[in-house]
Amino acid sequence: NPASMKSSLDVLAYADTRKVAILGDMGELGADELAMHREVGAYAAFKNTDVLVCIGALSKDMAEAAKETVLATEKNMKVFHFDTKEDFYQNMGQILKENDTILVKASHFMEFPEIVKKLSEEA
């Protein structure tokens, strides 16, 4: 849910290294789901996240809101959107750097533990 995502971004903000948030769709939000995804995207920019990777159909709105916030506030955050985890895997070598602090979070149905496993294998 959005509160959990924001709390996780709050914790990530304390990292001394480059901050990367890999976020996915949040499920079961009802009629406000697009607005809630946008809210999280904007929040990531305000929390000085260095890189935001959004994965999933609903997370496209998260990425768009983050990009809009970056432009409006002149924040220095890179934003990426991928439709699938597999699309992200093909690009993660160009996005992630050694010593990044990485937050991985999404609703359970997105099966993001797979991403954590993939990151561990690549480390």
List each model region and its residues.
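ATP-dependent carboxylate-amine ligase
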Residues: 1-123
